[in-house]
Every structure is written in C-alpha cells, then in structure tokens.
Amino acid sequence: MTDLNVSLLPWQQKVWNDPIRFQVIAAGRRTGKSRLAAWKLIIEGLGATKGSVFYVAPTQGQARDIMWDMLLELGNPVIASSHVNNLQIKLINGATIALKGADRPETMRGVSLKFLVMDEYADMKPEVWEQILRPALADQKGSAMFIGTPMGRNHFYD
C-alpha cells in the first residue's frame, strides 16, 4: 500500500496511541483537532473491511468547509475517487469516508460504521449520537472521536 506521511504533534500522538473506544478531545481553536480527525478517518477507513467511516459536523456545509479539502490533501495517495456533490470519498480498499451534517440525521440511519468523528458535538442534539450514530457502531464494535471547543457545561462537557 502507498505510504502516508502521518505527521502528528506530541499531544496528537498521545491521543492517536490511546486505545480507548470513545475518545473525547476538548481543545481550543487552531490546535489541530481537525487534522488529527482527518488522519484518523483515513487510517480507520483503510483498515475497514466493511462499512464506512463518517465525519459529522453540526451542518453538512460545516462538514464540507472544515474537512473536505483536508481529506483530499492528506489522503490523496489512497483515494480512488471523490464526489463533492454527496461529500463521499472512496478509498483504494473500497471503504467510504462520508461527510454528514447532524442537522439532517435521517441521512445517517441504517448504516454500519467502523469509525466516526463528531466535530463540535456541543452544537448537536445529543439524540443524533444516542439514537442514530451509537447504534450504527454496534455491529462492528466501531469507535468514535468527539472533538470540540469547550463551551461551558453541556452534553459535550458531560
């Protein structure tokens, strides 16, 4: 397989090496949360034998603005195709990385997920995780990364 030059900051490397199933990363703006998430999406996608990996932002527009170009840049050597209209990237192993908006939860029902990133989870309804995405991870015992900027006490804090 093509070599990817995964370059991480020391704090990102600690998170990367942590085997916990559900990671929560609360960090300030411009610290590298999204870049870490992009690398995780690519590597987890390459390791998926079935199912997909999702990146979920509060809206699909935010998902595109935050993650699309970064995934195309970092994953270029292992991307078989990309479709900006539906925000999906097909990797060379056949796995799909899909970018979704939590404001349209119906588009995320009925899938089997290997990995999931929820970005700015504090800006989403908790039901999106509890009723839709958590069950989508169950059959594969998939993992998830919650990232966001601290905003007081809410469901992301909990």
Model regions and ranges:
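Phosphate/NTP-binding elements of NTP-utilizing enzymes
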Residues: 1-158
